[in-house]
A protein has these predicted regions:
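Catalytic cores of glycan-processing enzymes that make or break glycosidic bonds
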Residues: 1-203
Length: 203
């Protein structure tokens, strides 16, 4: 669902995109580093201000030529895997939108999140909310995790599993329902959606 950062759309409407970020996919059995597609992520909050006018214009133009269309990676309407521009590896990404943990909450649980710029970390800081943290994907393979005492590993595993598999289910469903119905009602085209990989239960 992405557009190139060199596209006319990104040049004309830079406020509709997070040009400091890249869309991709989290690691899986086929890509242990995840995927980095290079597209800027959407600034959905800004797009919502005019009722998703940019999207609706695209849909109306498509309807002049097609009766049906396929959304590849439809999960992007629920959430996207977002990687800060300095990084190439999907390991340093995070979900957007998301419900990160506050630094205070993590410190109260015995963790000391720190933005070192290194990839060997347990948490990555949210790029738009200072001192709010996302568990780093696949962090159980890091030296930082290996050095934790067993009780803190157990605490981290509980936090990690909740974050990636439960915490966002209702949140992401609500996120998609704010966008998709309004866009699909714009035209009479038949929509088909496809995705694979880490699919939340709410999709």
């Amino acid at each position: 669902i992405g557009v190139s950062r060199q596209s006319v759309d990104a040049w004309q409407h830079p406020d509709l995109f997070h040009l400091d970020s890249q869309a991709g996919a989290p690691p899986d059995a086929f890509a242990v580093d995840g995927q980095n597609w290079g597209f800027p992520t959407y600034n959905w909050e800004k797009m919502a201000e005019d009722g998703f006018g940019w999207w609706k214009a695209r849909m109306r133009k498509m309807a002049e030529y097609f009766d049906a269309f396929r959304i590849d990676h439809i999960l992007g309407f629920f959430r996207i895997w977002e990687i800060p521009v300095p990084y190439k590896s999907g390991l340093m990404g995070h979900f957007n939108p998301a419900l990160p943990y506050s630094g205070e909450e993590l410190r109260n649980r015995g963790f000391n999140p720190e933005n070192t710029g290194d990839t060997d970390v347990l948490f990555v800081e949210d790029p738009r909310k200072k001192d709010w943290w996302h568990p780093r994907i696949s962090s159980q393979n890091t030296r930082a995790y290996a050095q934790l005492p067993d009780w803190l590993k157990n605490s981290y595993n509980d936090l990690y599993n909740d974050f990636f598999y439960y915490r966002h289910n209702a949140f992401w469903k609500e996120s998609a329902y704010r966008k998709l119905p309004a866009l699909l009602r714009t035209t009479g085209m038949l929509c088909c959606g496809e995705d694979l990989g880490m699919i939340p239960a709410s999709v």
